[in-house]
Regions:
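Extended acidic, low-complexity intrinsically disordered regions
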Residues: 1-215
Length: 215
C-alpha cells in the first residue's frame, strides 16, 4: 500500500468495523486521488494494469481507480507465493497481457434510434462528453456494459444498435470497426428468456446490486 507522497494511504480497516454497516465503506475509494490521476493519464493515452500479490490490507478499492479510468485491468493474487499455482497464474496473466493483440488511443460510441438512449455506462474507461468512451488501450478482454432506456413507443419491428470503435493497431494504422445489431422487439416474455445470455445477465445484476448497496 502506498505509504509516501501525495498518494499515501492510511490503514482504514479495523476489527471493530467488520460485520457492521461501516464495513461497506471499505469497498469504496478512500480518496478520489487515484481516479483523478487515472483521468489525467487518459489525456496522455496511458493505461495502467496492476498485478498485486499483497498478503495484508492494500486498499484495493482506492488504488484500482487507476485501472478503472484508464481501461486497465487489476489482477489480485491473495497471499501470493512465488511457487505453485499463483506463480503460474501471474506468469500466464503477464504473458497474455503483453502478447495479445491490442489497440491504442481508442474511442468508442454506441448509437441507438430516436426514442431511446444509453442511460448508464459501466466498465473501465473515461467518459468524454455524454456518450464517448475513451480507452488508451483496448483488446479482446475489454468489456463494457450499457443500459438503454426507452423514452417513447417504438413502432419498428427491430431495435437497431450500432457501435463504432476508432483505434490505432499495433502497426500504427488508424482503424475504425463498426458493429451493427438489429434486435427483434417482442411483447412475449418467453421470447426474451429463450434468447437471453444468462451468464451476462447474472454478472450485470451482481454488479448493479453491489453498486446500489454501496451507494
Amino acid at each position: 500500500m502506498p505509504s509516501y507522497g501525495s498518494g499515501k494511504l492510511k490503514l482504514r480497516e479495523t476489527p471493530a468495523m467488520l460485520g457492521t454497516e461501516a464495513e461497506k465503506d471499505l469497498l469504496c475509494p478512500g480518496t478520489p486521488l487515484y481516479h483523478e490521476l487515472g483521468v489525467a493519464l487518459v489525456e496522455k493515452q496511458i493505461s495502467v494494469d496492476f498485478f498485486l500479490g499483497a498478503a495484508q490490507y492494500a486498499d484495493l478499492p482506492t488504488i484500482s481507480g487507476l485501472c478503472d479510468a484508464t481501461g486497465g485491468q487489476f489482477f489480485y493474487y491473495p497471499s501470493f507465493h512465488s511457487e505453485g499455482p499463483q506463480a503460474e497464474a501471474l506468469f500466464g496473466d503477464i504473458y497474455h497481457d503483453l502478447t495479445r493483440e491490442t489497440g491504442f488511443e481508442a474511442v468508442y460510441r454506441v448509437r441507438v434510434p430516436q426514442g431511446a438512449k444509453v442511460s448508464m455506462f459501466h466498465g473501465n474507461f473515461t467518459l468524454s462528453n455524454t456518450d464517448l468512451m475513451v480507452l488508451p488501450v483496448c483488446h479482446a478482454d475489454t468489456t463494457v456494459v450499457l443500459e438503454f432506456s426507452i423514452e417513447s413507443v417504438l413502432s419498428m419491428p427491430c431495435f437497431p444498435i450500432q457501435g463504432a470503435l476508432l483505434y490505432t493497431n499495433s502497426r500504427g494504422e488508424r482503424r475504425i470497426r463498426v458493429h451493427t445489431l438489429s434486435i427483434p422487439i417482442s411483447n412475449i416474455l418467453s421470447h426474451l428468456f429463450e434468447r437471453v445470455n444468462q451468464d451476462v445477465i447474472t454478472a450485470i445484476t451482481l454488479h448493479q446490486g453491489m453498486n446500489r448497496h454501496l451507494d
